[in-house]
Amino acid sequence: MDDEETSEINSVQGQDEDVQLEVQPQAQGPQDRQVDAIEQAWNNATQDEQSPPAEEAFQDPLAIDGEGGNAPEAMVEDVLQDDTASEGSHPSSDMSLETPGSEDDSDLELLPRWMIPQNRLRSAVDMMVSQARNRDGGIAALLNRDNFLQRVRSIVFSQERRRSRTSEETSQEAADAEQPNDPPPQQPPRPPIDIGFDTNLPAEHSYFGNHLSRVPGVDYLEVGSVHHMLIFLHQHILFPGEVLPFMIDGRMFDEDMPGLDGLIFGVGFPLMQPPEDNPLKLYGVTCQIYERGESGRGLVFYKSRALQRIVINCEDIQGSPQYIARNPTSKCFSKVKILPEYFLPEPLQSVEMGSMARFRDIPSMRDKYRRFQLSTTTWPSDACQEYSFASIVERARQRLESQKIDTMPKCPIQLSFWLVRNLHLTEKMMRLTFLTDSVNTRLQLIKSTFKDESLFFCRYCNSSLAHCADLFAMSKHGVQTQYCNPDGYIHETNTVYRVMSHAIGYSGEPSTKFSWFPGYQWHIILCKFCAQHVGWEFKAVQPNLTPRVFFGLAGSSVRIGKASENTPFNGSTYVVRNMLRLISNEME
């Protein structure tokens, strides 16, 4: 808070001292008196303007349209200018992506009316006041916290600058106000991608160093068997076949590692909602360590691979399970049950054709043989084609052709899990595919998403960031891979070769240290709308690497949704809602 506001508050405290003494001590303490003084200062600063009635001031701030809000336009200007930059402010904090001198008060005249409605802004301020009453420090602490109103103002200006980039956006603003749910614009054509990079390097997680030693042994446990093992938690959903790198205190494992065989442990997923009929179930996977090495900081690097799906009865857990990415300090054990994987062959393969079966594998005779088989059954050809494993594989191959992936597994069980990771399903669909024991059902669920056009949305403000069609593989494991940062946090990273125009900002300075992609520097990127971390930009520092620039979106910060879902493309109608969400987050 600057000196002018402080002196004004002190003067108000002196003028209203008699009024404050009339309040009962039981109902108002020193903190509440300070809150009332700041509220009075706020009212004095705007007393020359016509304020809306009390019932209008507390209208639902999440509504987009509504009556009321008759305060003049000067009210908007007063509130925005109330928290301008001062000696104690931080205009270039993590919520502001522009330079300190980029805000010009003349921009206030250019603010579109839908951007920050008068009555909604007043309601937002009233909500800040009402929610801050019971917080430590009250409103004074809120106003002192990194100059919050200035940061909200910066976000509003950032939105306006993005809107005014092209000549078409002036006319588009009126259309957005009247029809906020217009379909998103068409995806721009995808140029050909030339990858001049060894995709084996990210898969080997070479940023851990070259001193890792191989731990032999890959053990698959019997389906339906129950085992007692060490368990951890993980913030993402892993599917069998994925690699999980992590850093942890070596004492957590070394005592339990049997000889030279890799240790098998369990990883549970709290995000995997259990069935309603049995809420005490925790689903996860078994992981086996296959490489280890010293980090030099008291921690040990481990590489593990997810092997089989498991289910854990929460009543059998001994101890408090901890997240594997948060440097667990205590061991937790539990009984785990290995879940089955059922696969039924294609319907026509179960039809016995006697001596004619020898024509099945001859390419030139395959179609004729299939037609002859269909003529001997009561099944229509469409039904057989619908459940054909080869048909699903071919359609998946065509969909992934542009992603430069040539490591598609042939085993149906492994393929079903591999497709989930590389086709980018919604969270609901990922849970369904994980919970099913039938490989055929899993493939049918995956097939149902082939026609969907999906986008990456910011998980915090629903702004669209990138098209899922722009995914490509910078690792031999596919477009989605788990990586570990120097602090041990595990990021699920999705590689795309471009993001939407004006969708991101940058934080900090680029660096090549601990780069997941050797030869590339990384730079933290933020959502341009809410300034939350959403991933990294990777830029080549060696002249022979291609692509020169690509992006990695953090799975914990983005979500996948259909392009047709009822979400504004640039978050235009969510401006006030997300301002309030930011206010709420700042007070927590």
Curated annotation (Swiss-Prot):
Disordered: region residues: 1-107, 159-197
Binding site for Zn(2+): C458, C461, C527, C530
The keyword Lyase is annotated on this UniProt entry: no
Primary localization class, coarse: nucleus
Any Gene Ontology biological process: positive regulation of Wnt signaling pathway
Bias (Acidic residues) ranges: 75-85
GO cellular component terms, A-Z: nucleus
Location of the Lon N-terminal domain: 228-454
Compositionally biased spans, kind Polar residues: 41-50, 86-96
Record-annotated membrane-spanning stretches: none
Compositional bias of kind Basic and acidic residues: 159-168
Record's compositionally biased regions (Pro residues): 181-192
Keyword set includes Nucleus: yes
Keywords: Metal-binding, Nucleus, Ubl conjugation, Ubl conjugation pathway, Zinc
Listed InterPro entries: CULT, Lon_prtase_N, Yippee/Mis18/Cereblon
Post-translational modification: Ubiquitinated.
Localization per record: Nucleus
GO molecular function, one term: metal ion binding
Quaternary structure and partners: Likely a component of a DCX (DDB1-CUL4-X-box) protein ligase complex. May interact with pic/DDB1.
Family membership: Belongs to the CRBN family.
Function: Substrate recognition component of a DCX (DDB1-CUL4-X-box) E3 protein ligase complex that mediates the ubiquitination and subsequent proteasomal degradation of target proteins. Has an essential role in mediating growth by negatively regulating insulin signaling. It also has a role in maintaining presynaptic function in the neuromuscular junction synapses of third-instar larvae.
Protein name: Protein cereblon
